[in-house]
């Protein structure tokens, strides 16, 4: 009996230690690296465009939110996908190589010893950004589009752009503004809820069907309303609605996305807006699931609920605003 008790105590202790250790390991894994972006000339404004996915059935009009940038030595506009789910900005190795080959004037600015571009200054709207270090991610297009008017996607613009600043996203006008403070005219019309920016994830509390949960705002999940668990997906689906299933690429890994219409609203303080769609994802790795669990994430919001609206990411003031 004593031996059995000792074994049980040892198992319990092991579970406690591994749980605590796992928590701190995941917290460390979830941390963002040092911010490498220096932004000048605030406030700055820029238009943005939508990249469509015409291969999906049905076609997706708002697959990615792209922001035009100007790279030294390149005569055509390049684009970065704006992804608040990415804690740091990066470039795509194949796209950078193609750009350097097509436009020799970019070779100095886009030199990448040890897979890192250093001290790149690029134009963003009517301002400038100095990126001290930009890692290269395997991927991108090995050839530039033949159509000179087609977007040249060279990387991801992450949430490091937001740190200590205010971002206004005007979906109706396809325009963004990065500033040091919230414009007074918009602040007067906005409903605000508290915002957290731990490890450069945009997190805030919102309610769905009366239940308040912590949500992460991820512009990289562009064509989604609410991404949640399969159980919540089944509960929130509109009765009789036909779900759609599509394959999506997530950092080089193919996942399966299940989406369906929902009658549920997203409640931000006193404001309510339709979620429109609810989604769950198949194919997440164990590490991704553990990161989600230990981050305290209750759901992930894409751009869909905010289409046609104006939102304010006031990271400096720790609040998320919906303009009425």
Briefly describe each language-model feature range.
Residues 2-324:
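Pepsin/retropepsin-fold aspartyl endopeptidases
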């Amino acid at each position: 009996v004593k031996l059995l008790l000792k074994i049980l105590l040892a198992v319990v202790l092991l579970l406690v230690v591994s749980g605590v250790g796992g928590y701190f390991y995941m917290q460390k894994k979830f941390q963002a690296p040092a911010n490498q972006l220096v932004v000048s000339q605030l406030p700055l404004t820029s238009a943005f465009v939508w990249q469509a996915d015409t291969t999906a059935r049905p076609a997706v009009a708002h697959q990615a939110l792209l922001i035009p940038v100007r790279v030294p030595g390149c005569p055509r506009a390049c684009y970065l996908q704006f992804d608040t789910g990415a804690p740091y900005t990066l470039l795509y190795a194949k796209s950078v190589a193609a750009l350097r080959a097509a436009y020799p004037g970019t070779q100095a600015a886009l030199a990448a010893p040890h897979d890192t571009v250093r001290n790149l200054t690029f134009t963003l709207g009517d301002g400038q950004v100095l990126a001290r270090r930009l890692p290269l991610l395997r991927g991108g297009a090995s050839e530039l589009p033949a159509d000179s008017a087609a977007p040249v996607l060279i990387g991801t613009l992450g949430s490091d752009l937001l740190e200590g600043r205010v971002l206004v996203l005007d979906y109706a006008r396809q325009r963004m503004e990065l500033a040091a403070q919230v414009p007074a005219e918009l602040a007067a019309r906005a409903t605000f809820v508290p915002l957290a920016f731990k490890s450069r994830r945009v997190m805030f509390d919102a309610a769905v069907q009366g239940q308040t949960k912590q949500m992460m705002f991820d512009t990289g999940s562009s064509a989604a309303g609410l991404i949640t668990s399969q159980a919540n997906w089944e509960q929130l689906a509109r009765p009789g609605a036909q779900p759609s299933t599509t394959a999506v690429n997530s950092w080089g890994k193919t996942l399966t996305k299940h989406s369906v219409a929902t009658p549920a609203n997203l409640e931000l303080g006193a404001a309510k807006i339709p979620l429109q769609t609810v989604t769950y994802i198949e194919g997440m790795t164990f590490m991704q699931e553990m990161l989600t669990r230990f981050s305290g994430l209750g759901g992930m919001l894409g751009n869909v609920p905010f289409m046609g609206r104006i939102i304010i990411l006031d990271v400096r003031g720790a609040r998320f605003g919906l303009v009425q």
